[in-house]
Every structure is written in C-alpha cells, then in structure tokens.
C-alpha cells in the first residue's frame, strides 16, 4: 500500500483467464472446475474447495497448512477419481496455487488464473464458499473439523436442489454428466 514493496510475489507461468476457452464461460461443457481455499480461525488451516461449473458439484478437503504443496496434494487427491472429466481449472492468484503446473500435468488439464481482486470471475466457487461457511463459520478453528464433518457438508451441499439447475441437485446433474461422459469415452475406445 502507498508505494510499498509487494510482498506476495507472483506465481510463475500463470495463464490468464482471458485465454480460457469461451466454452467454459457458456457452461456448455462438463469438466470445467473452479478452486479456492476457505481459511479457518488463526489463518493456518484451510479447506480446499473445488466445484464443477456446469453441475455445481463440490469437493472439499482439509489441509493443515495453506501451503502450495498441501493444496496441490489435496486438489490432485480430490480430482484424480474424475481425471478424465477435468478439462480446465480456474483459481485466484493465491500463492497456495503456485504448484499449478504440477496439478495441470497430473490431471492433464489446463490451469487458468482469474484477475487479481476479481472474485466475480469465479462466481460459482465464491458462492459455494459462502454456502460452506454455513457449516464452518469464519471464527471456527479448522483443527476441530473431522473428515466426517467435511463429508456431511459435501453431502448437504451436493444434495441441495438449485434453481439454476432446474431444481435438480448438483449430485443428480454431476452423476448424469459423469455417466454420459464415461459412455462417450467408452464408445471412442
């Protein structure tokens, strides 16, 4: 602030959201994901949140520290079961996403970064983070969260009907798309 030195640094080899294919914005394709972190009290522990843009399906993982290594490990772990359905990933410019190249290579996906201070460019994920806060409020220490708590939150969020999905649940839409995608892949091989 006020001409001081920038302490956050930059993440090397970032690809701007401006270069992301237009099909992602139109929500026409299954397999475009947004990711972020939700910070617990004390700013140490975090939840990695990932959601598929078309279905609004959410994945959540707890990380003991918000490091690039921990976040990339969590993202890879969450998305590996769906690796054939991961085309793009979009995040903010947080340093926790510094290992974006490792994530992209492991999942065979393209990785994009939104503009700084432009949370609306990842609106679905920011909305999801607000819903996640219903289960894990800002003042909550995340070292008290169990995997069972996370699974319960994911289940509730993914089974909540959404107006934008024609009052279907994210789980219903995700499973339909996943099944359709797997059948398409099977027919191509």
Feature locations, PLM:
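Mobile-element integrase/transposase regions
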Residues: 1-47
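Mobile genetic element proteins and their domesticated derivatives, centered on retroelements
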Residues: 36, 50, 56, 75, ...
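C-terminal domain-tail junction helix/linker
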Residues: 138-189
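Short small-residue beta-strand/loop micro-motif enriched in glycine and branched aliphatics
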Residues: 56-61, 113, 138-140
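Short, structured coil segments at secondary-structure junctions
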Residues: 106-107
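RNase H-like two-metal-ion nuclease catalytic core shared by retroviral integrases
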Residues: 91-94, 98-101, 113-134, 143-155
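Active-site beta-loop-alpha junctions of metal-dependent nucleic acid enzymes
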Residues: 39-43, 60-83
